[in-house]
Amino acid sequence: MINNRMKKHGMTAYRTRATFLLPMALSLIICHLSLSPARAQRQLSSVPVGSVKWTGGFWGERFDVLSKTSLQSMWETWQTKEGKGFNNFLIASGEMQGEHHGPPFHDGDMYKWLEAVAAVYAINKDPELERIMDRFIGCVVKAQREDGYIHTPVIIAELNKKKKEQQDGNDDTVVGTATGTKKDKAFGNRLNFETYNLGHLITAGIVHKRATGKTTLFDAAVKAADFLYDFCQRAPEELAGNAICPSHYMAVAEMYRETGNKKYLELLKQFIDIRGMVENGTDDNQDRIPFRQQYNAMGHAVRANYLYAGVADLYLESGEEQLMKNLTSIWKDIVTRKMYINGACGALYDGTSPDGTNYTPDSIQKVHQSYGRPYQLPHSTAHNETCANIGNLFFNWRMLEATGDAKYADIVENCLYNSILCGISLDGEKYFYTNPLRMSDELPYTLRWPKERTKYISCFCCPPNTLRTLCEAQNYAYAISKDAIYVNLFGENTFTFKPDGKNEMTLAQHTQYPWDNKVLLEVVKAKKAVNTVIKLRIPGWCREVNVSVNGCPVPYDREKGYIAVNGKWKKGDVITYSMEMRTRIVEANPLVEESRGQVAVQRGPIIYCAESPDLGDIDIDDIAIPVDTKFTPVEVVIDGSRMIALEGEVVVRDEETWKGQLYREVSRKNERRTIRLIPYYAWGNRGKSEMTVWMPAVY
């Protein structure tokens, strides 16, 4: 009766663990004996590491800051009194003595930083970066167990235990040493984040190999992946409960691509299958029910988006149609009901799950840093963890690879320019953990995370994740198919590749995007003319485009948000691509109560905000924007970074204080004033400030 009611109202019928545990176990046995042949469904492929290089412009400036300041600054942070991440590896490798310090996921955070260093090294071949990587990798290799397991809290505790037992004359137990174990304690507590750490080790090892040609870290990554495989075969249910922020899903998918070993693809499928084996699963961790029964985004936004990216990887390599049904439904739920205008995800700091709570009060669960109900998108209390926004990028990139549809590339671009770039200061040394749409000093409560950018946060997952994502942003600029080159992002860069598999060609983009609407795509190197199709993305915010080749307008086809330009390309050929880039006044769906009657401002891919340093005596609460306001682009410099701000006339309402009132009669006192809006990613770089993206509309 209850299940019928739930189906009638479009709700998921929650099965008990007993109803699916046996079939799930049987499916795992079958999967282990014979994995069905993969039917890859990839439409696009990523470009090789190092094949795209920023040469100037917006992303060239950001890459310079990241490569010359951010990486070294974070390396120093890892060795400070607060950070101590590197000290943990020194102790675990036997180079020094001591106790573990910091959260259990610090290992994974250091691996993310290492991945960022490797990505930069692939571009600039800086010997100092190579030296730093070699120093850290040496500790990782020495700390890793022979069976591939590595988790510095466990390794350090066991080394210290062994030392004490030797001192006491009782050398009976050695758990987690290089010689093996008598009792495997791995994955005893899901909040130890062991699979998260191992996943980032595997990914870092692959990127390091591709960037340097060395296999020192890659060999450790293979051992870690093999450890996960072996453990999953003997204790799948135990491993099922240890998939918090499942970076290991994407990691083993990439290991399969790197090695061609199908056991890693088998392992990825098992990871998704065993999620249904979790006893007392939660919506917060997306494991209350099996994944293939999930059609809406739920729970902790980082965990969710990493899960969706990992499942998309499985679809790319297996072609399982059911997975695409789940992913398409979840994507639509996010983009049309749960995503912020800046591409950010995860509206709630803390709350209760909107799923599975009907009819049975005992089933109500807590959630944190999570998706909320549809259209629940608060401004000041938006959590929007940078890691969740990065996960949104990962998910959409894989959906782009699966479909070749530019709507996914639109979100990749939105996240990069707005909700991810906002996570790091312009000088490259300070970070936000959360990314609200509004910051006001008037709120009478304290939120969990700092209102100012800071160099070190106790929960340090976002800073290195931001670094690696931005250091690898060039890899999203292009994608390739069997017969075309896809141009997804615009910026000053060069891209060297072999369109026909034999003859090398180098394309160069010349542009001041995102501030200017024109992009020149030049063939700067080609040994011989090559027939291929170049596909240029039409941004979702753009109404009109123009394209010409060598100064002459050319016919083109539109398909899935791309312009297809056919040609036999030779050195010196130039495509000129212009996109309409006007300032847009944007409103939200009226079901978003927090944004009703308000508007935001966007120009190109950039979301704008009002920040107190630009407002003088104007309070952010008193600004209203006439919907017919004409904003003028003006060049400004904030903390050494050039950008385009917008200036326009707005209505400034009466400045009377509320004096503790909750309601009062509307005041019609107002005046017209000209104010400046800055890019959202740049706020918070001039000290503590107030800020808002959404402002009341005047119609």
PLM regions with names:
Residues 21-34:
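Bacterial N-terminal signal peptides
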Residues 39-109, 134-174:
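Low-complexity, Ser/Thr/Pro/Gly-enriched N-terminal "stalk/linker" regions
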Residues 41-44, 93-110, 126, 163-165, ...:
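Solvent-exposed loop and edge beta-strand segments that line ligand/cofactor-binding
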Residues 51, 57-61, 65, 112-127, ...:
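Well-ordered alpha-helical scaffold segments within catalytic/enzyme domains
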Residues 146-147, 193-210, 217-257, 300-301, ...:
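Aromatic-lined, polymer-binding surfaces characteristic
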Residues 316-337, 377-429:
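Catalytic-core region of carbohydrate-active enzymes that cleave or remodel glycosidic bonds
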Residues 327, 409-418, 423-525, 558, ...:
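C-terminal beta-rich recognition modules with glycine/proline-rich loops and embedded aromatic residues
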Residues 542-566, 585-591:
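Solvent-exposed beta-strand/loop surfaces of large extracellular or lumenal domains
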